Amino acid sequence: MVYEHGGDVYRNKVRLDFSVNTNPLGMSENVKKAIAENIEQFGIYPDAMCVNLRNAIAEKEQVGADNVLCSNGAAEMIFAVVRAVMPKKTLLLAPTFSEYERALKSVGSQICYYYLKEKNDF
């Protein structure tokens, strides 16, 4: 199996990796503090419906909690949206994040590629 997802900093000397959604500056001190303050929660299986998280995001963004979707990452959300929409035909920019193509192929969508040109600083 070919490893197609980005973030392989173990085999590739990468300074800034734009193929994954990670913070190039590392974890913030606020996140480290929140983890330390809630370490006892880490042994509890998380709420699959993300009720508290969705409510907190909804309150902060002033929207209804029903308008907030949570996932374990971009790839999971991409696959979920593609499964919900089930597009028969899709226009996909290339090059792009590999999970778009994988998700579309998983539902049998006919993919039409629009290739960006490097000479135009895609």
Where do the language-model regions lie?
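Phosphate-binding glycine-rich loop
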Residues: 50-90
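Hydrophobic residues at beta-strand termini and immediately following loops
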Residues: 18, 45, 71, 114
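PLP-dependent aminotransferase-like
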Residues: 83-122
